[in-house]
Design a protein with these regions (language model features):
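Thiol-/selenol-based redox modules, centered on thioredoxin-like
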Residues: 162-238, 339-378
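A short beta-strand-turn-helix
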Residues: 42-63, 235-256, 276-281, 328
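Short pre-active-site segment immediately N-terminal to redox-active cysteine/selenocysteine motifs
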Residues: 61-63, 68-71, 254-256, 261-264, ...
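Bacterial Sec-dependent N-terminal signal peptides
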Residues: 1-26
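Short, internal strand/loop/helix patches
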Residues: 116-155, 159-160, 168, 304-339
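Short N-terminal segments immediately surrounding and downstream of signal-peptide cleavage
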Residues: 25-46
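Conserved redox-active cysteine motifs that mediate thiol-disulfide chemistry
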Residues: 68-81, 260-277
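Thiol-based oxidoreductase modules, predominantly thioredoxin-like and allied folds used
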Residues: 93-118, 133-143, 286-300, 312-323
Length: 378
């Protein structure tokens, strides 16, 4: 018996050691490239559909590689400065390249509260078009080989290389995150020194921003989604006055997305998952998602069952009267009555959006994040 237990214990320890060894070998701790190091080559797809490597920039005296992304509020705060940097130094033989290092698998919806887009390749194309990026915007989120080779600590993180592609500067764009306060002083000083052939006075700085979303660090995402799945889903009755109060939004201090729907409405059911995603993106901000079911009270159990399947842990109501026209007038006298119907109401009652039909999820996210009560930056 003791011998059997000993054999089992040895086998268990071997399994733990083997698993740990494999994990460490597969997922090394990324190390930031050191000053004086040669630029590692890469082969990455740009949002323009072209492949890029170091040789793509052979004609440039200075190569600036910036690891950044769509979703991070700090990265977004620096977008315009990186655009200006690119335009200002293009004629001086400086090439700016931006690489998105993040794995989509490790990026969860709660981390998208300051953006309208995630970090997928398709969303990168949309952001580049929306902002008019004048630089190559490359995707490394699939294998993250380039990010591992360079070791960015956060987004954004800048690497400046001379004509021999030796690293001369590694660090921040500047020390003032808020748009309008900084002009990219740190990276501009570094580029100017490299162009002049002189040593960069401050070759390394710390960086501030969002951590890189490594593909193997997705435990928190799985845990968060499980927590969301376990949140209680409720359905309460609401009367005419209650609906009017919701639309007035007098004291919540939150931007309200109000959706009127029904279980028998095909478009309502079709768009509902997108509304849940939007709620999960922005529920950590001054935002709340509210649904009002136009189903009859006799179908209350069916409504709740649908909401539970959707994991709709937001505020959910069902109109408590038989006369649906009272509900229509309470929501919006201008509403014709067709479902779905969606409102976005600022704190204080200003309606900034209303639509009788399905929403466009991408447009809705942009509307929300660019509202004065939400915003893209800290």
């Amino acid at each position: 018996m003791k011998k059997s237990l000993h054999i089992c214990l040895v086998f268990l320890l071997m399994m733990i050691y083997t698993h740990t060894g494999i994990a460490q070998a597969t997922h090394p701790e990324p190390k930031t490239l050191e000053i004086g190091a040669k630029a590692p080559d890469f082969n990455l797809l740009g949002v323009d559909g072209k492949m890029y490597n170091l040789n793509s920039f052979n004609n440039s005296a200075v190569l600036v590689i910036i690891f950044s992304c769509n979703h991070c509020p700090t990265a977004q705060a620096y977008e315009d400065r990186i655009i200006s940097l690119t335009n200002d130094y293009k004629s001086k033989g400086v090439a700016v390249v931006v690489i998105s290092p993040n794995s989509v698998k490790a990026l969860n919806l709660a981390e998208l509260g300051y953006t309208d887009m995630g970090d997928s390749y398709e969303e990168m194309k949309l952001r580049a078009a929306d902002k008019g990026f004048p630089f190559p915007y490359l995707f490394d989120g699939e294998q993250q080989k380039t990010a591992l080779a360079y070791g960015p600590a956060a987004t954004p993180h800048c690497f400046v290389f001379d004509k021999n592609r030796i690293l001369c500067y590694c660090g921040r764009v500047d020390g003032a995150e808020k748009p309008g306060t900084g002009k990219g002083e740190d990276i501009r000083n570094a580029i100017n020194s490299v162009l002049a052939g002189t040593a960069v006075k401050v070759p390394v700085t710390k960086v501030f921003g969002c951590s890189v979303k490594w593909s193997w660090k997705d435990e928190y995402t799985a845990k968060l989604y499980q927590q969301w799945a376990e949140l209680p889903v409720t359905l309460e009755d609401i009367d005419v006055q209650g609906i009017k109060d919701l639309v007035k939004n007098p004291s919540s201090g939150k931007l309200r997305l109000i959706n009127i729907w029904a279980t028998w409405c095909g478009p309502c059911v079709t768009e509902f998952p997108d509304l849940v995603i939007i709620d999960r993106m922005y529920r950590g901000r001054p935002f709340e998602f509210i649904t009002i079911s136009a189903d009859k009270q006799a179908r209350k159990a069916d409504v709740l069952n649908f909401l539970k399947k959707q994991q709709a842990s937001n505020k959910n109501y069902i109109f408590n009267k038989e006369d649906v026209y009272q509900m229509i007038e309470a929501v919006d006298p201008e509403w014709q009555g067709a479902l779905p119907y969606t409102l976005v109401v600022e704190p204080g009652g200003k309606i900034i959006y209303k639509k009788q039909d399905m929403i466009n999820p991408a447009n809705m996210k942009k509307l929300i994040v660019e509202d004065k009560s939400i915003g893209r930056y800290y």
